[in-house]
């Protein structure tokens, strides 16, 4: 995805998906392709938040005002100029028996999302631009900036519609306040809408829902033998002025 970092521009909306297709063709077969954008949203400009909330003594990043989930139909084999663009609060239309690729992108400033679809299984096939061996999972945990592609097989019996879930991890924030943590949309099997399938509510916050260390690249690339070792200790915390910073070996950036 593309985004601007100057004064937190991407948190204010300067961000968009950017899909690069393999010249030799996709690593897996599927029938259709959607991009799913997950994000948090602040009503104040990010520059104001940095100055008045984060970069002050004992400051912290405030709780978002809302979460966002929206879709783009990035249809397999078509150029970008033919794409219809993003659609917020849309439904995701499936046809029975087809296999769909969903490209999940977390464009948040601070929020981790837990994504699943009731009544459907998923297989991770790509992580951060790297094709991986099929990894079955019922939930995809997407950190800030991460990208995953999953294959979802449509049901053979189109008798019900199903709920799409994107839970915002509450451990990211302090006081949640009025923030709605569970975003939902609708996976449909018909133009007129149908009875909803059973909704599966999950308590996901603070839990490890998938083991990304088990993802295996589909095309392995060997590592060179190192001749020098560099140790970096990465942490976040308060500097000497009690301002929040991330640091390498206790040097803040």
Where do the model's predicted regions map?
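Non-cytosolic beta-sheet module surface loops
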Residues: 8, 105-108, 154-156
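General structural concept
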Residues: 1-5
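Short alpha-helix capping/helix-loop boundary micro-motifs
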Residues: 85-87, 133-136
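Beta-strand elements of modular eukaryotic interaction domains
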Residues: 26, 90-92, 102-105, 113, ...
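Acidic-aromatic/histidine active-site loop/patch
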Residues: 32-99, 105-108, 228, 235-237, ...
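Extended terminal and domain-junction accessory segments
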Residues: 12-47, 135-253
